[in-house]
Amino acid sequence: MSSTDRPVVRRDFTEKTHATSYPFISPLAQDLSGRRVLITGAAWEDGVGYATATAFARAGASAIAVMDLRGISDDLVSQLKAAAIEAGRPECQVVSGRVDISQWESVAAFKETVSEAFGHRLDVLVNNAAHQEPYSSILDADPDVYWKTWEVNVHGLFNMTRAFLPMLIDTRAKHDGLGIMINVASSGALSVRKGGASYRTSKLAVLRWTEALNLEHGGDGLLAFCVNPGAIKTHLTINEPEEVRNMLPHKPEIAGDTIAWLAAKRREWMGGRYISCPWDMEEVLGRKDEIVEGDKLKLNMHF
C-alpha cells in the first residue's frame, strides 16, 4: 500500500477511549426534563440519529422532534416513548416528519410544525443528517451524486440553522433554554485517502462553519460545536468498501449517549470546537484548561 492509499491515522486526544457507552455519560444520570430537542437523520435503527433520540428520551427530554428524508416510522416513535418509560421517565412527546434538509421549503414547513408542537421553544438542535457518495475518484464520480453530498451536508446545515437558530436563541433568552447546536462532523475531515473526497471535504467545511457560527451568534446565546460520532457501521457507510465497514469498531450508543451528555449542560468553552464521541469525557473535562489556553480542538494550519 502506497502512502497515498493509506489513511492518515491521528492520535486520539484522550488516553482512554470507548467503543460503546459507559457510566460517566449514561443518560440515566442526566436530567433533561422540560427540554425540547430536534434531531435530523433519525430514521435508521442502527444509526446515530436514532441512538441520539433514544438517549435524549432516556435522559428525560420532554419533547423530541425527529426527521429524515425517508420519514420516521410509527414503530420508531413508539420505541422512543417506550425508552423514556423504561428509564423511569415520563413519556416524551415525539414529533416526526419527512424532511429533505437540502430543500428550504421542506425545512421551513417542518419548522412550523415543530414550533407549534413545542410552544415555539427549542433547547437543542442536533444536525446529524448526512449524505456520503460512493467511493470513487473525482473524475469517475457521478457529478450529481458527488455534489449531493455538499447539498445535504453543507447546504442542509445552513437551511436547518436558518430555520431553527432563531428559536434556539429566543428560547435561551425567554425561557432559560440551553441554546445548544451540535453539528455531527467526522474524523474523515481530518485525513485524506482515495475516494470519498466530497464527504471528507464537506465535513471539513462543517468544522470551520460551526466555529464561525459560534463566533457570530455566541453573544446571542448560541453554543455551537461539532462532534465526531465515531467509526460506526451504519446505513450512511453503505457506499464504503465492505472491508472498510467491517473494521469500524464503534457502536451507535457511544455517539448517542455522548451527544445527550454534551447537551445536558452548557459548557461555554466547548464553543466552536471538535469533540470526538469515543474520547473519554471525564478526561476531556479534566483537560479543560489545556484546551482553552492552547485553543485546541479547532482547525489550524501550522507554518
Language model regions located:
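C-terminal helical subdomain
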Residues: 10-21, 226, 243-303
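The beta1-alpha1 cofactor-binding region of Rossmann-like NAD(H)/NADP(H)-dependent oxidoreductases
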Residues: 74, 97-110, 143
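Conserved mid-core segment of classical short-chain dehydrogenase/reductases
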Residues: 108, 115, 132-147, 166, ...
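Catalytic Tyr-X3-Lys loop
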Residues: 123, 131, 139-158, 181-182, ...
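Catalytic loop of short-chain dehydrogenase/reductase
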Residues: 169-219, 231-232
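Amphipathic alpha-helical dimer-interface segment in Rossmann-like NAD(P)H-dependent oxidoreductases
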Residues: 112-116, 152-176, 214-215
